[in-house]
From Swiss-Prot:
Matches recorded under SUPFAM superfamilies: Ribosomal protein S5 domain 2-like (SSF54211)
CDD domains per record: IGPD
NCBIfam families linked to this entry: PRK00951.1-1 (NF002106), PRK00951.1-5 (NF002109), PRK00951.2-1 (NF002111), PRK00951.2-4 (NF002114)
Gene3D superfamilies named in the record: Imidazole glycerol phosphate dehydratase, domain 1
Annotated metabolic or biological route of this protein: Amino-acid biosynthesis; L-histidine biosynthesis; L-histidine from 5-phospho-alpha-D-ribose 1-diphosphate: step 6/9
Protein family (similarity comment): Belongs to the imidazoleglycerol-phosphate dehydratase family.
Organism field: Verminephrobacter eiseniae (strain EF01-2)
Keywords of this entry: Amino-acid biosynthesis, Cytoplasm, Histidine biosynthesis, Lyase
Catalytic activity: D-erythro-1-(imidazol-4-yl)glycerol 3-phosphate = 3-(imidazol-4-yl)-2-oxopropyl phosphate + H2O
Pfam families the record matches: IGPD (PF00475)
Annotated protein name in UniProt: Imidazoleglycerol-phosphate dehydratase
Enzyme's top EC category: lyase
Length: 210
């Protein structure tokens, strides 16, 4: 197990849903900044080109401003980099959401990319859960090991406190499969994070907390 140091900013419950988190271990040094009410701008430096491309899809289609800087042990492989970015992004998202008052909480999205079709269902529940099925047609996409898709989302949900159901329903090209998943994730997350004006700032749970 590695140790980590969190350096957050932003106030829970504030109107600005912005947060910055740093995570430093013997394997990676990661900093993530998110603005949940952004315009989809992204600055991404993970050292893995295809992974940067997927994070860019998340920002663009989620309308989240996202700044990710990671220096990882890529001389070994991409596992620690991808997993730790997922962890740190989850921590930043959790902090930026604050008390979660007024958010829609639940959402889903279907996104096609040519022959590929993916569905993602989100519950911002406070309970981490990942249920993922992507029958990738190839083990690698450029310099990206497709198994790391699971590691990214597992790290993310564990620290964001989100339940995700991710299914690639159709697909032949592995690039298309993965990209349709990330686009659907972005669209569903964007909808779940939207503030519902009819909720009058209430928590979307009969428990009174998420």
């Amino acid at each position: 197990m590695t140790s980590s140091a969190l350096v957050p900013s932003g106030l829970p419950g504030s109107l600005d849903r912005i947060a910055e988190v740093s995570r430093n271990t013997a394997e990676t040094r990661v900093s993530v900044r998110v603005n949940l009410d952004g315009t989809g701008q992204a600055k991404l430096r993970t050292g893995i080109g295809f992974f940067d491309h997927m994070l860019d899809q998340t920002a663009r289609h989620g309308l989240i401003d996202l700044d990710v800087d990671c220096a990882g042990d890529l001389h070994i492989d991409g596992h620690h980099t991808v997993e730790d970015v997922g962890i740190t992004l989850g921590q930043a998202l959790a902090r930026a959401m604050g008390d979660k008052k007024g958010i829609c909480r639940y959402a889903h999205a279907y996104v096609p990319l040519d022959e590929a079709l993916s569905r993602v269902v989100v519950d911002i529940s406070g309970r981490p859960g990942l249920h993922l099925h992507i029958p990738f047609s190839a083990g690698r996409i450029g310099d990206f090991d497709t198994q790391l898709t699971h590691e990214f989302f597992q790290g993310f949900v564990n620290h964001a406190g989100i339940t995700l159901h991710i299914d690639n329903l159709k697909g032949v090209n592995a690039h298309h499969q993965c990209e349709s998943v990330f686009k659907a994730f972005a669209r569903a997350l964007r909808a779940a994070l939207e503030r519902d004006p009819r909720s009058a700032g209430r928590i979307a749970s009969t428990k009174g907390s998420l």
